[in-house]
Amino acid sequence: WDGKTDLSHHNLREVEIEDLLPRKKIEVDMDAIAKMLTGKRILITGAAGSIGSDIARQVAKFNPFELILVDQAETPMHDIRLYMACNHKAQKVLTIVGSICNQKQMETLFRNHTPEYVFHAAAYKHVPMMEDNPAMAVQNNIYGTRVIADLSVKYGTKKFVMISTDKAVNPTNVMGCSKRICEIYCQALNAHQQKTQFVTTRFGNVLGSNGSVIPIFKEQIKRGGPVMVTHPDIIRYFMLIPEACRLVLEAGTMGKGGEIFVFDMGQPVKIVDLAKRMITLSGAKNIEIKFSGLRDGEKLYEELLATKENSMPTPHPKIKVAKVREYPYELVLRNEIELYKISESFDDIAIVKKMKEIVPEYKSEVSKYKILDN
């Protein structure tokens, strides 16, 4: 093989995600999860995404009364619809194409279906994309979360579980900061009312999710390389999608409201080692690894707790509670309204400046917004 021609896909062994992250299956309290979900009305936002769709598949097994799935991506939603029709014929499933930012559409949904449990997985998640589009991080991630959270309270949802990220900890990019602001809002709203319990789950990268390194590396290996890694020292915490989703459900049963649950992600993984392992497992030869440099807003390593946070154990060995600073609801709401107004100007610098005011620990890395840090 001359290294120039495309490798035949048939010559390469299909790399299984589980081979890349060998570990014991995480056990969860199935009885508690069943009690929470069986016979209930469950809403999942971002239901077409990697996490949302897996939560949907897991929830469907517990026979909820009604499963309401919302996402703006029509084709993946159609895929989920077909999956449910095939695998859960008796299950009442609603697939709604819509945006969490469309307040009127979401209000109609809540009025008609009054979900008892909400799993909020909808978000823009790609760091470089949000560095270039901070207005959309504000309007989709922050405002969209507020729309769904407020409607949950208005229509008497019992529990709202938000999916957050380790990028919200000491954020270095717009995406991470937007998720930290969502966490702050959920905690403040939890303390502000007694109807709905707001719980946040925070975890790192999930292996094999849409647009993550695994599918990208697979494609690069298939083409004969090079495999592009941003930096030789970059490390990330990884989980398998099903184990992350199982822990989301477990945290949902545990949360009494106001908690930020942090998942034990195991040992961090060097991305370059992951690339080498994938090349070896695929059986490919002479594949070069090249380093492209850190992307805008990218950290060398992620943290699951911020500098001033500490964590408390829970009954589950893989789940801890982060003790974080909380803010009064009126201040949080005022900040969000101001930030949304600024986002309508699509002035990137002004938007990020306000985000840094709200989250003072947000310090930009490899980014045009570094000029805003003092």
Q: Model-predicted segments: where are they?
A:
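Conserved glycine-rich Rossmann-like NAD(P)H-binding loop of the short-chain dehydrogenase/reductase
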Residues: 64-79
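Conserved residues in the N-terminal Rossmann fold of short-chain dehydrogenase/reductase
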Residues: 96-97, 139, 291
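N-terminal Rossmann NAD(P)H-binding glycine-rich loop of SDR-like oxidoreductase domains
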Residues: 42-62
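Strand-loop microenvironment adjacent to phosphate/nucleotide-handling motifs in alpha/beta enzyme folds
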Residues: 27, 32-34, 188-374
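Proline-aspartate-enriched helix->loop->beta-strand connector
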Residues: 64-65, 110-119, 127, 157
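Conserved Rossmann-fold cofactor-binding substructure of NAD(P)-dependent oxidoreductases
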Residues: 96-117, 297
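Flexible, Lys/Arg-rich cytosolic regulatory linkers and terminal tails that connect or flank
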Residues: 1-41, 153
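Conserved Rossmann-fold NAD(P)-dependent oxidoreductase catalytic core, especially the SDR/UDP-sugar
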Residues: 2-10, 120, 124-184, 188
